[in-house]
Amino acid sequence: MLLVKKANYGLRIEGHTDNVGTDSKNLILSQKRATAVKNYLKKKGVEGSKLEDFGYGESKPIATNDTPEGRQKNRRVEMTITFR
């Protein structure tokens, strides 16, 4: 795995939600999603110092929240490899 072998790489983990529920609950849920991915990767051998986790709640949708399909797409975690 790239993050285990390369010291100069990191991973930005971003949690997102749909717009169902309150802003504060969605922010907490999105952070929990990102943290769950971070914890999984740490168990797989990735150093915690290489991982950054963020929760954005419903603030960055990639689809409409007007349909069940769109809301499903917005409930996600995105990861970006970073160079440190």
Residue spans for each PLM region:
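Periplasmic OmpA-like peptidoglycan-binding domain that tethers envelope proteins to the cell wall
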Residues: 14-84
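Periplasmic peptidoglycan-binding/tethering modules of Gram-negative envelope proteins
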Residues: 1-10, 82-84
